[in-house]
A protein has these predicted regions:
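Soluble ligand-binding/transfer domains with enclosed cavities or grooves
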Residues: 2-180
């Protein structure tokens, strides 16, 4: 990770205040983390190269920011079950700066909701992220305002944020992760 120790949650900090090797290295390990810890990990992660995300990545929804209590727990439990329909994302870089992608749903049978990829400033802070923009005419109207972004936690593991872009502001609605 390329950040100061202050950006790393205390649960992943060594006793001397330096980053430890306990930064999660799997989708399952990320599922156990709360929203504040995910936010700190995201801020401290790296900007991925488009070439590194090429191909099919397994996905996992981690946590929602718009629900609390039992509702949030129920959503997390469903997201970690085999019944959850989202399987991941597939990335097809065009060059080092831009690319395309699509979501894989229901046992990878359906490829839905195309997005364009590019590196730009994150909505979460003063750093860059790989942006996933769903605003294209092939997507249904309710998908077009979604703006995802991802950062690399470790080789082969990416942490993402999903935003809903409304006329006046973008609102963070959930965290997700992708893995090779």
């Amino acid at each position: 990770m390329t950040s100061t120790a202050a950006a790393i949650p205390s649960s992943t900090r060594a006793a001397n205040g330096r980053a430890s090797t306990s930064v999660p290295t799997s989708l399952d390990a990320l599922l156990a983390l709360d929203v504040d810890t995910l936010a700190a990990l995201y801020a401290g992660a790296r900007v991925p190269n488009l070439a590194d995300v090429r191909g099919d990545l397994r996905g996992r929804m981690l946590a929602t920011t718009v629900l609390g209590g039992r509702a949030a727990s129920a959503v997390r439990a469903f997201a970690s079950s085999s019944a959850f329909p989202w399987r991941g994302k597939s990335f097809m870089p065009k060059d080092a700066l831009r690319g395309d992608g699509i979501n894989r749903v229901v046992r990878d049978r359906w490829h839905l909701y195309r997005f364009e990829t590019f590196i730009a400033r994150s909505r979460a802070g003063d750093f860059d992220a790989l942006q996933l923009d769903y605003d294209n005419r092939d997507n249904p109207f309710f998908i077009r305002p979604i703006k995802d972004e991802i950062r690399e936690l470790s080789p082969g593991l990416w942490l993402g944020q999903a935003y809903l872009q409304l006329p006046r502001a973008a609102h963070l609605v959930l965290y997700f992760a992708l893995a090779r």
